């Protein structure tokens, strides 16, 4: 795997960020840079304005040296005013993505870049083009992307006349990970370690050469982790060119845009898209950790499907997760209840224990173990309620058991809980519950499961 990463990097020339348009040199003097100084609040930055005279990198430079870091021109520090990015985010709350992109590029010039993942965030590049301003694009090549994603990279470069800056993982770190744990260790002990080596550390190197970056995050992508992302913020996790906490600004122009609207924009503007989208993929990452979503599933359920909803961030946007594992269980109490229907029985822990004890039941029971804050539970709510209506009076009780918080350990030990949602069928004459094995949570699939085993 280390050899694959190394060989792929040699195939791509240049590591300084690409610029859009042949007029970038003439515009360089008009672009201003921003220098960070001491601050008292993370939402504020002190900056000074100075004309930027950037010299392009010589093509004779070693690509290894240039790929290891993104070098931004140095500027002198001068006294300046304080900018409050929390207030700016509020001002831009009703702004269009185009307005937000224009503001970001105007403010940071060539010290800001678009993070491109090879999915629908190609919309960011189109918005940048529409501003008429120079822009830069970078992407993380983990060495394990789908072929369709690499083809999209090529199509985007040709469409916009740019060179995407590809950042690669450290070959030594990848080699150590694979030799010690194998190629697919993330299926057994979680994806965080692999993502840290292949994505987070390369991103950290990239951002150290910038003062701001632009992402394609949307609030509707993951209610569990992204529901509160602002239009613009001081990055809570990564450092920028000037170093230290608060030295990097993060822009999210699509934060308030729904996925359907993004796709309407892409179709209208005839923008190249990843061929995987036509195969049912929505959220696209590395090949082993990405799959198509199914009816009744949330788009992020196509990523790291073997893990809980709260774990479905790779670390690039870790600041979205405001609570750690233990704290997450204390949050759901304030979340609106789901699976509310006269045909769905709400079970207590005692009720579940009784089901476990019975070997001969008068009726079969179908029980969903859920957490109301889980976006994947929310996504199957309509299907489950419809199923309950169809099974009413037909010898199968449909129920729910809230298995987060204090009940989580009990559910893990006694009810086969691995992730939310978990669906169990307690047959009429069987001592053990049968766990629904599929990710298909549409009405027909669930009904077939019940009818075959009831």
Curated annotation (Swiss-Prot):
Residues 67-319 are annotated as: Reductase domain. It holds the Pfam family Thioredoxin. The modification N-acetylalanine is found at residue 67. Residues 333-454 form the Thioredoxin domain. Residues 1-21 are annotated as: Disordered. Its cofactor is [4Fe-4S] cluster. It catalyses: glutathione disulfide + sulfite + AMP + 2 H(+) = adenosine 5'-phosphosulfate + 2 glutathione. Residues 1-66 form a transit peptide. GO terms for biological process: cysteine biosynthetic process; sulfate assimilation; sulfate assimilation, phosphoadenylyl sulfate reduction by phosphoadenylyl-sulfate reductase (thioredoxin). The active site is at 374 (nucleophile), 377 (nucleophile). Disulfide bonds join 374-377. Stimulated by sodium sulfate > ammonium sulfate. Keywords: Acetylation, Amino-acid biosynthesis, Chloroplast, Cysteine biosynthesis, Disulfide bond, Oxidoreductase, Plastid, Redox-active center, Stress response, Transit peptide. It is found in: Plastid, Chloroplast. GO terms for molecular function: adenylyl-sulfate reductase (glutathione) activity; adenylyl-sulfate reductase activity; phosphoadenylyl-sulfate reductase (thioredoxin) activity. GO terms for cellular component: chloroplast; chloroplast stroma. It is an enzyme of class 1 (oxidoreductase). Leaves and stem. Gene3D superfamilies: Glutaredoxin, HUPs. The C-terminal domain may function as glutaredoxin and mediates the interaction of the enzyme with glutathione (GSH). Active in GSH-dependent reduction of hydroxyethyldisulfide, cystine, dehydroascorbate, insulin disulfides and ribonucleotide reductase. PANTHER family: 5'-ADENYLYLSULFATE REDUCTASE 2, CHLOROPLASTIC, 5'-ADENYLYLSULFATE REDUCTASE 3, CHLOROPLASTIC. Belongs to the APS reductase family. This is 5'-adenylylsulfate reductase 2, chloroplastic. It comes from Arabidopsis thaliana (Mouse-ear cress).
């Amino acid at each position: 795997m280390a050899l694959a990463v190394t060989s792929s990097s040699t195939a791509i020339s240049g590591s300084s960020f690409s610029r859009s348009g042949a007029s970038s040199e003439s515009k360089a003097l008009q672009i201003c840079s921003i220098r960070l100084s001491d601050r008292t609040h993370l939402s504020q930055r002190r900056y000074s304005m100075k004309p930027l005279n950037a010299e392009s990198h010589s093509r004779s430079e070693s690509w290894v040296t240039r790929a290891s870091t993104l070098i931004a021109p140095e500027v002198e520090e001068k006294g300046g005013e304080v900018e409050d990015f929390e207030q700016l985010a509020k001002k831009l709350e009703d702004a269009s993505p185009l307005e937000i992109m224009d503001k970001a590029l105007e403010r940071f010039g060539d010290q800001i870049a678009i993070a491109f993942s090879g999915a629908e965030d190609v919309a960011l590049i189109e918005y940048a083009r529409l501003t008429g301003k120079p822009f830069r694009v970078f992407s993380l090549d983990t060495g394990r992307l789908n072929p369709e994603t690499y083809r999209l990279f090529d199509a985007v470069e040709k469409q916009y006349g740019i060179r995407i800056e590809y950042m690669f993982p450290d070959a030594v770190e990848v080699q150590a990970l694979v030799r010690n744990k194998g190629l697919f260790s993330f299926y057994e002990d979680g994806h965080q370690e692999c993502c840290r080596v292949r994505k987070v550390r390369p991103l950290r190197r990239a951002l150290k050469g910038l003062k701001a970056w632009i992402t394609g995050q949307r609030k509707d992508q993951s209610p569990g982790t992204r529901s509160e992302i602002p239009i613009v913020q001081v990055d809570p996790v990564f450092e920028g060119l000037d170093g230290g906490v608060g030295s990097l600004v993060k822009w999210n122009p699509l934060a308030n845009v729904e996925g359907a609207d993004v796709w309407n924009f892409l179709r209208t503007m005839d923008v190249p898209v990843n061929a995987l989208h036509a195969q049912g993929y929505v959220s696209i990452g590395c090949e082993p950790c990405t799959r198509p979503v199914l009816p009744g599933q949330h788009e992020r359920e196509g990523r790291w499907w073997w893990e809980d909803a709260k774990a479905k961030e790779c670390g690039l946007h870790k600041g979205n997760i405001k609570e750690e594992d233990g704290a997450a269980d204390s949050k759901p109490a304030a979340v609106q209840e789901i699976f509310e229907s006269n045909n769905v029985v709400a079970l207590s822990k005692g009720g579940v224990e009784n089901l476990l004890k019975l070997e001969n039941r008068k009726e079969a029971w179908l029980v969903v173990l859920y957490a109301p804050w889980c976006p994947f539970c929310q996504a199957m709510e309509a299907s489950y309620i419809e199923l309950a209506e169809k099974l009413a009076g037909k010898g199968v009780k449909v129920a729910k058991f809230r298995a987060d918080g204090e009940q989580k350990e009990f559910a893990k030990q006694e009810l086969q809980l691995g992730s939310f949602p978990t669906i169990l069928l307690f047959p009429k004459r069987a001592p053990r519950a049968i766990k629904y094995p599929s990710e298909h949570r549409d009405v027909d699939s669930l009904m077939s499961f019940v009818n075959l085993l009831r």
